[in-house]
Amino acid sequence: MEVIPFESLTLTDEQFLAGSEDGKRVTIAGELRLPRSGTDRLPAVILLHPSGGIGGQIADWEQWFLSLGVATFVVDSFTSRGIENTINDQSQLGRLAQTEDAYRALSLISKNPHVDASRVMLMGFSRGGQDTLYASMVRFQKAHADASTPGFAAYVPLYPDCSAHYLDDDNVSQAPIRIFHGSADNYDPVAPCKAYVERLKAKGADVELTEFAGVNHIFDARAFAHPTSLPKAQTVRNCAWEERSAGHLLNVKSNLPFSYADPCVERGVTIGYDESATEQTKKAIANLVTTTLKPTPTRAP
């Protein structure tokens, strides 16, 4: 394992949406793990953590991808910014900050001699899932991504929040987008994602949403073997926001700039592991990896 520091920016949502690169510079880090030694260039997946930071579920996914012959790069978007987690206070970091981190991570590892820049996938969870989803937007790529490197080969958001409606958000990458969500998710409900997917499909995007009946948020985290209540966790499940002019997010109900102090922002969610949903998600992602990243499986010693 190699810890690799790299420079990113801490941007407000307004700055990010306006295409600004004038945010506060920050050196964050990622952990690169390779499935095997050697000199060949490997496919890779960049992983964006949820509001709780890097936990056991990320380690599980790392080991799983490594077993498929895929290198992993886990981006820590919190530590260098002085954040432990954003569960109870999402205002600590812009909602699109991890998208900026993802683009910069892609630029970084694309230059790594062990990584094939044309075979890098982006995967994220909850907060990291929404940033994975919107990283597919062509508008954001033109404004913030490194034009000298290939784009992501695929996007895999797990239980993202889809309540925001950005300008040109139906113009996305031609790469596959595969979303996995639970019907019982009361943290980031699936309904807005279903509506967004329909808009994307109408524009010809290669997007699919897999919905698991009765499944909660964070369904892939074994640490939450039983449904767990987080009474203070902030959720925007009853909010809808819209970017009506570049850089300005408005609460659809009030027509005022969105704030986490808005009445629609509530507290109290349930999270919980679901083995069946996790295994079905792995099976689908394994198929995606085979078709898009084309790894050489790691052989057991």
Where do the PLM segments sit?
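Cap/lid segment of the alpha/beta-hydrolase catalytic domain
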Residues: 52-59, 63-67, 77-97, 135-143, ...
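C-terminal catalytic histidine-bearing segment of alpha/beta-hydrolase fold enzymes
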Residues: 206-301
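Catalytic His-Asp charge-relay segment
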Residues: 174-181, 185, 208-210
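Alpha/beta-hydrolase fold active-site loops
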Residues: 43, 153, 176
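Short substrate-entry loop that stabilizes the transition state in hydrolases
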Residues: 38-42, 47-84, 164-165, 184-190
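Primarily recognizes the serine-hydrolase "nucleophile elbow" in alpha/beta-hydrolase
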Residues: 94-173, 184-187, 191
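N-terminal cap/lid segment of alpha/beta-hydrolase-fold proteins
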Residues: 1-40
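Short alpha-helix in the alpha/beta-hydrolase fold that links the catalytic acid
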Residues: 60, 189-199, 224
